[in-house]
């Protein structure tokens, strides 16, 4: 029989927030007796935007903005019912997007 696994993927714009959330998830899973692989940092997506400062002329005057999306991946191997319960009750920061897959 194949081992059961929970794959958790986190996305956030702030790297401190995502690291804090990842450590909370790892600590909760280990406390309930599950084995955790990760957090594995995935490549950061950088979106750059260039905006003209002047409304009419002066094409040389521009501002550049960058939006970074940080991602982390974690696998929880052989989770118990207690682990799933604790993860569902876990309250993470509002700026972190969480995707959970059961395999």
Swiss-Prot record:
Key words of the record: Ribonucleoprotein, Ribosomal protein
GO CC terms: ribonucleoprotein complex; ribosome
SMART domains: Ribosomal_S10
GO molecular function terms attached to this record: structural constituent of ribosome; tRNA binding
PROSITE patterns: RIBOSOMAL_S10
Role played: Involved in the binding of tRNA to the ribosomes.
NCBIfam families according to UniProt: PRK00596.1, rpsJ_bact
Protein name as it appears in the record: Small ribosomal subunit protein uS10
Organism name: Methylococcus capsulatus (strain ATCC 33009 / NCIMB 11132 / Bath)
Origin organism lineage: Bacteria, Pseudomonadati, Pseudomonadota, Gammaproteobacteria, Methylococcales
């Amino acid at each position: 029989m194949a081992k059961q696994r929970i794959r958790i993927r986190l996305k956030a714009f702030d790297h401190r927030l995502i690291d804090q959330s990842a450590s909370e998830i790892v600590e909760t899973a280990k406390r309930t007796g599950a084995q955790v692989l990760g957090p594995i940092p995935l490549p950061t997506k950088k979106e750059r935007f260039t905006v003209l400062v002047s409304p009419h002329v002066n094409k040389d005057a521009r501002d550049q903005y960058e939006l970074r999306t940080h991602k982390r991946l974690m696998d929880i191997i052989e989770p118990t019912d207690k682990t799933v319960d604790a993860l569902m009750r876990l309250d993470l920061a509002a700026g972190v997007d969480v995707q959970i897959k059961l395999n």
